[in-house]
């Protein structure tokens, strides 16, 4: 923290780094303790298993532990190449339990960090549009794989579908992931 402050950094957001989903409440308790001891971070994006019917209760427990929470994140990116895949399948945004839990976020005042590959962006645009009262952040600038045209074209087409959505912001991070 001293090094960052010396370089002019004045605030930081902790974004969950893939703790086990059965430990996400413990994670919030831990990061709140870090904040209590140091004053850092200033905001938190946590995680919860949004495919679990009990995710609402988990998020309520997280919220009770920390006023720093601003949202939640669950990686949905799926790729034909298993090495790039995180989600169990390409259509996770259609899961009824997942969608019900996303529907809880606006009431919590939380955003959802959306991590998808370009091939999922058309689906993501419909998904984001279905939840107009929830803020979404497109993670890693939409997961552009490389600067080769075969990758840039679907990425650009996907961004054109997402760009008009007023409840979506893009995070410039992890470009080229």
Task: List each model region and its residues.
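An N-terminally biased module of ancient metal coordination in phosphate/nucleic-acid-related enzymes
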Residues: 1-33
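Conserved, mostly hydrophobic/aromatic
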Residues: 12, 31, 44, 62, ...
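Short catalytic-loop micro-motif centered on adjacent basic/acidic residues
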Residues: 14, 43-46, 111-115
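Glycine-rich phosphate-binding "P-loop"
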Residues: 16-19, 74-93
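Short, electropositive alpha-helical surface patch
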Residues: 24-38, 125-137
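Glycine-rich anion/phosphate-binding loops
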Residues: 51-59
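Catalytic pocket-lining loop regions of alpha/beta-barrel enzymes
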Residues: 88-177
